[in-house]
Amino acid sequence: MSGGRGSSSGNPADQSEAAEPNQSSSSSSSSSSSRGRRTADRQQVDIQPASEEDVDLAEVLAYLLRRGQVRLVHGSGATGLQLVQSYSDSDEDSDGAWEGRLGDRYNPPVDTQPDTQEVDQSEIRTQILLATGCSTLKAQHSFTHMLTEVRPQTSQTQSTNAIYLSNDIDPCSFRSFLPNYVSHKDTYQQKAFCGVYSEDGNMFLSACQDQNIRLYDTTKGRFHLRQTVKARDVGWSVLDVCFTPDAQNVLYSSWSDYIHLCSIDGDSETHTALDLNPDERRFCVFSLAASTDGNEILGGANDGCLYVFDLEQNKRTLKIDAHEDDVNAVAFADSSSQLLFSGSDDALCKVWDRRTLREDRPQPVGQLAGHRDGITFIHSKGDARYLISNSKDQSIKLWDVRKFSPKEGLAASRLAVTQQNWDYRWQQVPQRALKRHKLTGDTSVMTYRGHGVLHTLVRCRFSPEFSTGQRFIYSGCSTGKIIIYDVLTGGVVSRLSGHDACVRDVSWHPYEDNIVSSSWDGAVRMWEHRQTHPLEEERERERDCQREKDL
C-alpha cells in the first residue's frame, strides 16, 4: 500500500506507512511488463485528497486488520480501544520472519563467512592496500608505536583528527580510529530524511520532514546551525538534497514537478524552480546529483526516467526512459561527469554515457544484475570503475563497471523481483527474501550483509579516500544503527548505536574522522573517535555482545 502526501502523525496507523508515498516496493505482482506493473500499482494505491478519495479508510483498516499488520487492543482512550501495529504474520514463514520493528532491536542477518573470492582477485583490493600502506607492511608494532607514527598535518584544510598510516603500520589499526561516540547532535520535531557534507567538509546540509533545510557550520570541529531555509512546494518531505560544486547553492527535491535551486551565499535566499515537465500526474525525484562543472542536474524519478536539467539553458534537456520501475538512485561515476549510474526498484543498476544519451534510443552502456529486490541507493567510488548499491534484499553489493551482467543475469534478477510479495515500508522481511546464494549471472564483486533496509530508501557510501583510503563501506540501518563494513573482508567492523528509529542517511567528513547520521527519530548526530583504554574497549565489546544476546 501507499499513502498520500503529508507528514506522518502519532497515529500508529499512520506509522505503518513509513516511507515516501508511492515509493512502491519492487515486489509487484508478476506480469509480462514491469512498466505495466508500476502503472497498475499506481492506479490501485494512489490515494487522493478527501474530496476525491476512491479508497475508503474503513477498507484500508479492514485490510490491515485482515493481513495482521495492525490490531486492536484495550487502551485508556475514550473508546477503550487502541490501534497498534502488529508484527506477527499469518503466513507459513512467520516464525522465521525478520521483524522490522525498532523496539525489537533485532539483529539483521550477517554473513559469518563472506565470499571474498572475487574481491581477492580484484583491482580494488590492490588500490585499497596501496592506499592504506599495506603493500609494504613490515612487522606489526605496538599501539604506542603506531601513535608515534601518525603524520603531522600539512594544510589548514586537513583535520587534526584525520587518520594517517605510514607504510609500516598495520592497516587494521584504522579500526582503532573509527568514530565511536556522539560529540554533537541536533533534534527536530519530525523525521530527518537526508544529510550530506560539502565537498570541503566545511558545511553540513540536513533536510527534515518539517520542510526545513538546515545548514551547519562544521569548520574546526564545530557543528553550529548557520542557516535555516524553508523549502517550497514540498509534498510529504524533502527527499534529497545536494550542494552545487561551488557550495554556493543547494538543490532539493520532493513530490513535485520541480527541482528547487536555492542560494545559500549571503543573507538573502533566492529560490529557483527547475521545471522537469513530467508526464506523470504524481511525480517525484528521489535522487539528485550535480555535474562537476555545475551546469547539469541529474535526477531519478518515480516514472522510471532519468532527467537532465541544464542550468545555463534553464530547461530540461533530456528525459531518458531508463528503468521498468521507480529510479531511486542516481550518481556520476567520476569528476568528468560523463558516466552516469542509476538504480531502480527493478533491482538493476545501469551505466550510461552522457555523450551518447538520446531520448529516442535510451541504451545504457551496460547493466549490473544480482540483487533480488529494489535498489535504494548507489554510491560511486569516484574512479569510474567501482560503485556500491544498497537494496531491499538486505544487502549491499560492490560492482566493477567493466564486468557487466549477461542476459541470463538480467533475467534471473527480474524473476527474483517478481517473486517478492512483501512491502518493505511496513511489513516484516520474510525468511524467503533473505536467500544468500548468488543469482545466475550475478557479476558483483562482493556482497555485504548485516544492516536492515526497511521503511525508507536507506543509504550507503564509501568511506573517504583522504582519511581511510576508502577501506570501508558504511550504511544507515532500519534498526537505528550505523553499520561499517570492511570492503575487502565483508565483515562488520563497527556498529554505532544511539538512534531510536531508522537511520536513513549517513555522511562521513571528507577529511576528519567523524560521521553524521540522519534518523527518523528526528535526531542528527555527529560521531567522532574517542580514545579509550584497551581494557575499557574490551569490556565495552563484551557488554555489546551480551546486549546482542539478550535481544
Task: Name each model-derived stretch.
Residues S2-Q190, S198, E537-L551:
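Intrinsically disordered terminal extensions that flank WD40 beta-propeller domains
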Residues N107-E312, L318-A322, A329-F332, A369, ...:
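WD40 beta-propeller repeat fold
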Residues A273, Q363-P364, P406-W426, L535-R543:
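Flexible, disordered linker segments and immediate boundary regions flanking tandem C2H2 zinc-finger modules
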Residues S336, G382-D383:
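Residue-level recognition of beta-strand termini and adjacent short loop/turns
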Residues L348-I375, S380:
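Acidic, glycine-rich loop-and-beta core segments that form the ion-binding/anion-interacting portion
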Residues Q427, L434-L439:
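Catalytic lobes of large eukaryotic enzymes
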Residues N514-Q546:
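Blade-level signature of beta-propeller repeat domains, shared across WD40, Kelch, NHL, RCC1
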